Structures are given as structure tokens and as C-alpha cells.
Swiss-Prot record:
<keyword id="KW-0687">Ribonucleoprotein</keyword>
<dbReference type="GO" id="GO:0019843">
    <property type="term" value="F:rRNA binding"/>
</dbReference>
<keyword id="KW-0496">Mitochondrion</keyword>
<keyword id="KW-0699">rRNA-binding</keyword>
<dbReference type="Pfam" id="PF01479">
    <property type="entry name" value="S4"/>
</dbReference>
<dbReference type="GO" id="GO:0042274">
    <property type="term" value="P:ribosomal small subunit biogenesis"/>
</dbReference>
<dbReference type="InterPro" id="IPR002942">
    <property type="entry name" value="S4_RNA-bd"/>
</dbReference>
<dbReference type="InterPro" id="IPR022801">
    <property type="entry name" value="Ribosomal_uS4"/>
</dbReference>
<dbReference type="GO" id="GO:0005739">
    <property type="term" value="C:mitochondrion"/>
</dbReference>
<protein>
    <recommendedName>
        <fullName>Small ribosomal subunit protein uS4m</fullName>
    </recommendedName>
</protein>
<keyword id="KW-0694">RNA-binding</keyword>
<dbReference type="InterPro" id="IPR036986">
    <property type="entry name" value="S4_RNA-bd_sf"/>
</dbReference>
<feature type="domain" description="S4 RNA-binding">
    <location>
        <begin position="105"/>
        <end position="179"/>
    </location>
</feature>
<comment type="similarity">
    <text>Belongs to the universal ribosomal protein uS4 family.</text>
</comment>
<comment type="subunit">
    <text>Component of the mitochondrial ribosome small subunit.</text>
</comment>
<dbReference type="GO" id="GO:0015935">
    <property type="term" value="C:small ribosomal subunit"/>
</dbReference>
<dbReference type="GO" id="GO:0003735">
    <property type="term" value="F:structural constituent of ribosome"/>
</dbReference>
Length: 362
């Protein structure tokens, strides 16, 4: 009996070793950004920090070292199994920015920045299952460092499914949450649907055709095409800059706010009401390591209110993405390279279902 209990205890202790690393993460890897264990660690770290500040047991020197250890643990939660000794390697280091930029060149992190996948555990799972290629070769190392000019692609059998999932999530996130959610207060019959109804509609061909025929989306598309023409006249070729945030999301929101602002001004002119000259909300971000603080104004229907926004950005990598294939080319530094001959740049012109079944560019 004692021997049987001992064997059962040994099997329980060694049970995690039988599974892969992705299976050790509790919860649904595909839908959660942090697992239950990771959230518990973060909660304990926050409670520990508050208790130290309240009791004032340690001196300021020990408190700062403890906060540094906290930040390394939080970084390891995001970037995976991160060795803490690597953070403290070298006494001449004055900043952690080069270290963070080095972490941003990892294969799993770049897949997340590309918005090919939603979470880093999801990216690690695909890499470990050998589904993603670098320069047409299979890579199964999650912390693989990508160099300048590397081409990221999926296998042929997995590329079509992955491309459809990316496009559907892209349209759900932009059109349902960002655009349609803003226009629900307008008396338009088409937009007065609940969020779940739009999620179900965008999965079908009928919903995509209904969205393509909308006058609002056609106006938004024409304004963005005019912007592209002006950009090509200035710089000579189409270029897309994607960093830690999705640049096209910001661009669509900016055009949306601009169109709403212009329609508001037209209504005020028709009513012969005195209007204030207020510029629309525009965020100007520079490509330096620490971008300058920018100014923005309030919405047109409010009083003029000037706010100062302080922003710190890390321009780590610039990517040229094709969401139809899907493929991407990695470029580091402030300059974006030229588009290769075998990749067509489809930044916003993603594929939607149409009547002929091949799709229609939006």
C-alpha cells in the first residue's frame, strides 16, 4: 500500500513532463492573453509591492532593486522564459531600451506585431508545430532572431485558412468595434444592428456584400485612395509602417473622425450657425526613439480644449505585409526597403467574399 502511494505520488510529480510546453499553459491558449497562473503571479507581485510601500520595512535601495526584479518578471510573462541574469549582464548598461529592442526581434513577438496571431502563446504553438516558414525554410525555435530582409510565410495548406481567419478578425475588429460602434447613434437602418448580429453577418457572403454596397464604406475607401495617391506623389512608392500598433487601424479611425467632422460642419453651415474653426484629431508621431509630445483638440461639438499628450514609442521594426497570402518582410531601422517582386502589397485592400467566389478588394 505504501509503495502504491509512492508510485502515484511520483506519477503526479512527473505528469507535466509528458506534455509539450504549450500544453502546460492552463486555460484556452487561443483566446486568452495571460493564463490563470500568470495572472496570479502578477496579482501577487502587485500586492507585495503595495505591502512594502505601506510598511516601509526596507530602505529605498532595496525597494528599487525589488521593483527592478518585478519588471523582469513581468517581462518574462510576456516574452516567455526570459533569463533574469540576461537583464543584469554587464555593468555599463545605462538603459534597458537596447535589451527591449533585442527582444522585439524574436520570431514569436514579430508574429504578434504582424497581427497574424492574437497572443504570444498562440504564436509559439504554431512555431513549435512547424507551421511558419522563414525564407522558405521551416523554423521550430520560438526565440529565433529575425534579421533584416527575412521573409515570413506559412505553409501552402495552412496559408489559405490562416489568411481567411486574419481577414475575418481584421474586419470584425475594425468595422464592428471601431466604425459600426461609432455610428450606432445615427438614424441609418443598416447600422442599427447589435454587435453579435454583425459578427454573424460578417461570417457569411451576404453580410460581406451588404457591407461592400454601403455608401459610407465607399466614401471611406475613396478618401483613403486619394491619400494613397498623394503619398505616392511625394515618396514615389507605396510604403507601410507597422510597429507595436496597427497603423491601418489608426488611419481608418482618423479618416472616420475627419468625415464625421466634415459632415458636422456641413450641417452647421446649412443651419447658418456660427462654427468654431477646430482642426480634427490628428496624432503626429515622429520616427525617433522618443517621439515629441503632440497636441490634439477636443471633438467639434465641444469647446476648444487643448491637451498635451506625452508619448514614448519604440520604433523596433517596419514590416511590409500581404494579408492575402499571408506573407511579410521584416525591415529594421528608420528606412523601409523596397517591395520584392513576388509580394504584392495589400495593406488595407484585403480580400472579401464576392459573387464570383474569388473575392473583391475593399
Amino acid at each position: 500500500m505504501w509503495l502504491l502511494k509512492k508510485l502515484i505520488q511520483r506519477d503526479i510529480d512527473l505528469s507535466p513532463l509528458r506534455f509539450q510546453t504549450c500544453r502546460l499553459l492552463l486555460g484556452n491558449v487561443w483566446n486568452r492573453e495571460l493564463t490563470i497562473i500568470q495572472r496570479r503571479i502578477l496579482r501577487r507581485l502587485r500586492n507585495r509591492k503595495r505591502s512594502i510601500k505601506k510598511r516601509k520595512i526596507y530602505s529605498k535601495k532595496y525597494l528599487t532593486s525589488y521593483i527592478q526584479l518585478q519588471t523582469t518578471r513581468k517581462l518574462s510573462l510576456f516574452y516567455g522564459d526570459l533569463p533574469i541574469t540576461e537583464m543584469h549582464r554587464g555593468t555599463k548598461r545605462t538603459s534597458y531600451i537596447p535589451f527591449l529592442l533585442n527582444l522585439e526581434t524574436r520570431f514569436d513577438v514579430i508574429l504578434l506585431r504582424l497581427h497574424f496571431l492574437e497572443t504570444i502563446p498562440q504564436a509559439r504553438q504554431l512555431i513549435s508545430h512547424r507551421r511558419v516558414c522563414v525564407n522558405k525554410g521551416m523554423v521550430s525555435i520560438t526565440h529565433f532572431k529575425l534579421s533584416h530582409g527575412d521573409i515570413i510565410s506559412f505553409q501552402e495548406n495552412n496559408a489559405i485558412i490562416r489568411g481567411e481567419e486574419i481577414r475575418r478578425s481584421f474586419y470584425k475588429e475594425i468595422l464592428v468595434e471601431k466604425i459600426i460602434g461609432k455610428l450606432l447613434h445615427q438614424p441609418l437602418r443598416m447600422w442599427r444592428r447589435s454587435k453579435t448580429e454583425w459578427f454573424h453577418l460578417l461570417k457569411t457572403k451576404r453580410g460581406c456584400r451588404l457591407l461592400l454596397k454601403s455608401r459610407f464604406l465607399q466614401q471611406l475607401r475613396s478618401s483613403m485612395q486619394e491619400e494613397d495617391l498623394e503619398r505616392t506623389k511625394k515618396f514615389g512608392s507605396e510604403k507601410v509602417c507597422l510597429g507595436s500598433s496597427f497603423a491601418e487601424h489608426k488611419r481608418m479611425k482618423r479618416n472616420l473622425l475627419k468625415s464625421l467632422f466634415l459632415s458636422k460642419r456641413r450641417k452647421d453651415k446649412n443651419l447658418n450657425l456660427p462654427t468654431r474653426t477646430i482642426s480634427p484629431i490628428v496624432y503626429n508621431s515622429s520616427l525617433s526613439l522618443y517621439s515629441n509630445s503632440t497636441y490634439c483638440f477636443a471633438s467639434p461639438h465641444k469647446l476648444t480644449m487643448k491637451r498635451r499628450i506625452k508619448r514614448i514609442e519604440l520604433p523596433t521594426h517596419y514590416l511590409e505585409v500581404n494579408y492575402r497570402t499571408p506573407k511579410a518582410v521584416v525591415f529594421y531601422g528608420p528606412n523601409i526597403g523596397h517591395i520584392p517582386h513576388d509580394i504584392r502589397l495589400k495593406d488595407l485592400n484585403l480580400l472579401l467574399w464576392s459573387r464570383n467566389g474569388r473575392g473583391q478588394n475593399i
